[in-house]
Amino acid sequence: MTTFFNKLFTGASSSSSAAASSGMDLGSMESLCAAINELCSEKHVSENVGELAAGIVRKNKELFEKKSNDVEAFLLHCSPNVGSAAMVAAIKGMFDTSAAKNNETGTDRAVELLNHYVDENNFVGGHLKLVPEIIFPLLRDVGLYCLEKKNKPEIGQRIIMKALGSMFPRNGSNAPNVLTSAHGVLFACALETKDYASVEPFIDLHVDEIANENCIQDQEKSDNRERDFGDVFLGRMKKGAAFGSQPVAHNPHLHPKYVLDYLYNGACILIELKRFEDALFLLEICVGMPAFSVQDQHLDSFKKYVLISLILKGKVDVTENGDKSAIRHFKTKSPEYKQFSEIRFSRSSNTHSAVESLVKSAKDRLRKDGNTEIAKYLVVEMKKKTIMSLTRMFTSIRISEIEELAFLKSRDQVTELIGQLVEEQRITVRIDGDMVFWTELSPVPSKNDVENKIRIVDHLNTLLHEKNTTMKAGSGRMRPSVMYNEDEGLSMPPTESKFFS
Amino acid sequence: MQNELLDDPMDTGAPAAEAAAADEPLPPAHGIDREVTPKPAGNPDLMQQSLDNPAIPMHLIEKRDDRRESCDDGYSLTVNESAIDIESLACSYDSNAFFLRARFIARHCPILRADAYISLINYLKEHTTDITHYVAFFNELESELARKEFKNRQLNFQIPLRDQKWIEENGATWQSTTDQLQAEYKRHKDEGVKESTRRAMEDLFQHYMMAGKIDEAIRLYSRGIRDYCTQLKHSINMWINWMEVAICANDWGKLDTVTNTAYRSLKDADDAEKNSQQSQQAPPQRGENAPYMVERDPNAPIQTLTNRQLIETALAKCLAAQVLLKLRNKRYSQVVETILQIKTECLQSKWFVTSSDLGIYGMLSAMATMSRADLKLQVSGNGTFRKLLESEPQLIELLGSYTSSRFGRCFEIMRSVKPRLLLDPFISRNVDELFEKIRQKCVLQYLQPYSTIKMATMAEAVGMSSAELQLSLLELIEQKHVSLKIDQNEGIVRILDERDENAILKRVNVTCDRATQKAKSLLWKTTLAGANIHSISDKETRPKRKNQKESAKFDRNFGGIDVDEDPRGIAGPSGLSDDFNIAYDQQPQQQVQYLEDLGDI
């Protein structure tokens, strides 16, 4: 594996050898490693070792950045069974430090190390989840690095998939569906590699949680702020503590743009997989998200939403997409898609010809937006809808009349479309001379199926009530201005660790 | 010259830029006017020269005529049947109403084109000074007579001779009269006497109307005519004129605005009149409650009756105009409601729409939109509608056939009256749609008792061909009015049972899927809210909104607009201009007085 990475990342070298040959002092990292390994001793309960290790890591985060040269030695001596969190923190420190210095050798080495440990299943997934502020930003940054810097999206995809798979196994478990910033990058890599099937399991239409990648830093900030207030205003410690604790509850768990990435990129993958209903759902969520200023992905989502909605429904229900003013803004920004959004399928109006004309006139815009293939699919689907509408109105019909009523150009076209519909198992056809006997294949749900769906609706309704109650009781009613910490707390001034003291 | 006088900002208070923008359409018309009616009225030789040179003036005349006919030019209709008697048309409609309808017939009915143009030419010569249309129609008539297809055709009217003397005389006097009237209007306006200004404005308006210059008339009325109407009868006359000129110009937007405003004003006047009558024991007094009332002798019942009649006549015309608007906008159910509100006995007999016209419009709209029960109650059993249709026995039979389910006879009558309706300029565009709706209702009614029926039998019963019937059925299916399947092999139609268990299960399944989708969408939002993610971008990153400036501008403009005035807001400044002029006139006196006071010191 090391040899394989050396071929991919040219210029990579072993920093551990260099460190060993230089005779650098590894005392601090060595002490940290020893402290973590001691958690394996009998005096600690096995279930708590992960949390304890995570706590140690958070308190010594700056050490990994300062001692990035000792990372490999640390990784060699640290036990993955208890030190997974520390190991990823070390790799992250190495990666971030190298990236900050534009040290491509260092970043390549960090990626190589991460891939090695992830690929060998050395990390304990449960422990990694305890440091969301470390593992998910690391996966995201590594994925982006492979995608944009190295033009090797397949490597980034594999690393993220293995890591997420270890943290959130997909083997039928009842684990909650978690949205992280790494998911969006994973989907972006998959769109480049065109490997859609392998990432499909990671696309959840129903998300239970959003990873809190900011909370821990905010808590530490709050603690530091309390100490500062305590030192300066000794007699007003309570007020300072109260003031410092307020921002914690209202900081977003994740930068909203990562949610946008998840929704948009996930929808794009589902479109490639022809799962249009699910893609439409994600796009609808994306388009309906409120925003003070329209993002590019926001607008791109609307464009895809229009096309996919036409494919599925033959019309665009813009009134269900939340803010109407936003919809108007989208239409203003994209006049071609405004015309698409005004289409309502009607056989007698010859909609498929109108759509085809629109696609031809807007082909440049569609090409720029990367929607050419979807538009072509839309044109064909509109023709199929025309045929399907006839199957619902006739039990038997002459072929010549199909051509006339469907506004098609030739009998061959009619035959081709009917053949495609049969292959897709949407209709059954029997031809007797000039007469076509056909029927639509629409499965009739059984009573049990309907009852199950009713139970699902009831369950969702109950869940909504519970969530609404929780939000009313909690901080959901407070909507302060959104504040983000872009540097993720890694630029905090170094402080003496309590552990070492 | 005339534009400078009328567009003086000091006179009307209108912004100069707005006046310039409003005048943009004028150059072609003005150019035509100059060509047709040159200024030197005393020099007939120049007029003769311009008329002897047919290329330029005729082209400009044609161009102007085409511009005024822009609404009809986009409507391609040809009726190859003499469904209307032009002579009867002239007897049924008066003045501009006849002009409008005859011109429409001339454009869309080749068989009646020559007769229509002859009638129009005779009308213009006898009742107007419209030499522009006179010449244009003469040219059209000559072109029509020169066609090969016309050689074997017989005319119902005598072909008139071009009266060059009449053209010259009217062309010579028109401009001088225009200048005189404009000067009179400006003088009275400068003097600040409202009644005189109104009278001068009215004279100028009628002058424009007589010459067929509809655009000029509309523009004149848009410059604050309301401010000079101090009496009820003047306001009523103003509203009626405004509605009529809007109809003549095919300006439906203007007509919508005018009728809405007029209706509110007339209703207020009507309420005031009723209150006045209720308190007839005490003498009526002017005040806010009676803005349109004039003090009068309570012992004069004729005056009271006259005011009452004026209001009711104006209201009837206003509602009739609204019927035309609703018909134009395809609001058929509202057409019926509005017609039922009209006091047709107060409607002028030869106006743009007669009682018979209203009856036809209302009946067809009702048949296309109402259920049979409502139709029997509100139309067949309504004395008002029977009275409106008393001169239309064929249409009464149509209504009876429809309600009696005699569909074959119903469609036969529809086919026979269709050409005539297509030549009605106000319902022509709606005929096909209305007839299709009626036909679909008939088909639905016929299908109701059957679960399976042969196509041939049904086609025979409803008087359609199999192809026509199939098309109607397809439209009904696609509009979800009926659920059926056509078996062409067997030639039968099968009605689908929507109460079938499978159908119900499918519908419940779809409903559950929709509910699930909605619930999941809401859960997404709660999850985001739980993570304190409320918006994609921060408020501080929001770009400066352009509508803030527009909102401020709107606020400034809104303060100067009277909501009852013309939407363009021209009348508002015009109303203010009078006060401004008065203040401006008084200002020098104040200064002089101040100087005098200083002199004393």
From Swiss-Prot, chain A:
The keyword Nucleotide-binding does not apply. GO terms for biological process: cell cycle switching; establishment of mitotic spindle localization; mitotic cytokinesis; oogenesis; regulation of oogenesis; ubiquitin-dependent protein catabolic process. The keyword Cytoplasm applies. InterPro entries: COP9_N, CSN3, PCI_dom. It is found in: Cytoplasm; Nucleus. Its main location: cytoplasm. Disulfide bonds: none annotated. Residues 275-445 form the PCI domain. One of its GO terms (cellular component) is COP9 signalosome. Signal peptide: none annotated. Keywords: Cytoplasm, Developmental protein, Differentiation, Nucleus, Oogenesis, Signalosome. Belongs to the CSN3 family. Component of the COP9 signalosome complex (CSN), a complex involved in various cellular and developmental processes. The CSN complex is an essential regulator of the ubiquitin (Ubl) conjugation pathway by mediating the deneddylation of the cullin subunits of the SCF-type E3 ligase complexes, leading to decrease the Ubl ligase activity of SCF. The CSN complex plays an essential role in embryogenesis and oogenesis and is required to regulate microtubule stability in the early embryo. Mediates mei-3/katanin targeting for degradation at the meiosis to mitosis transition via deneddylation of cul-3. Component of the CSN complex, probably composed of csn-1, csn-2, csn-3, csn-4, csn-5, csn-6 and csn-7. Within the complex it probably interacts directly with csn-2 and csn-4. May interact with itself. This is COP9 signalosome complex subunit 3. The gene is csn-3.
Curated annotation (Swiss-Prot), chain B:
The keyword Nucleus applies. GO terms for biological process: cell cycle switching; oogenesis; regulation of oogenesis. Coiled coil: none annotated. Residues 1-10 have a biased composition (Acidic residues). InterPro entries: PCI_dom, Rpn7/CSN1, Rpn7_N, WH_DNA-bd_sf. One of its GO terms (cellular component) is nucleus. Residues 14-24 have a biased composition (Low complexity). Signal peptide: none annotated. Keywords: Cytoplasm, Developmental protein, Differentiation, Nucleus, Oogenesis, Signalosome. The keyword Secreted does not apply. Residues 338-500 form the PCI domain. It is found in: Cytoplasm; Nucleus. SUPFAM superfamilies: Winged helix' DNA-binding domain. Essential component of the COP9 signalosome complex (CSN), a complex involved in various cellular and developmental processes. The CSN complex is an essential regulator of the ubiquitin (Ubl) conjugation pathway by mediating the deneddylation of the cullin subunits of the SCF-type E3 ligase complexes, leading to decrease the Ubl ligase activity of SCF. The CSN complex plays an essential role in embryogenesis and oogenesis and is required to regulate microtubule stability in the early embryo. Component of the CSN complex, probably composed of csn-1, csn-2, csn-3, csn-4, csn-5, csn-6 and csn-7. Within the complex it probably interacts directly with csn-2, csn-4 and csn-5. May interact with itself. Interacts with rbx-1. Belongs to the CSN1 family. This is COP9 signalosome complex subunit 1. The lineage of its organism: Eukaryota, Metazoa, Ecdysozoa, Nematoda, Chromadorea.
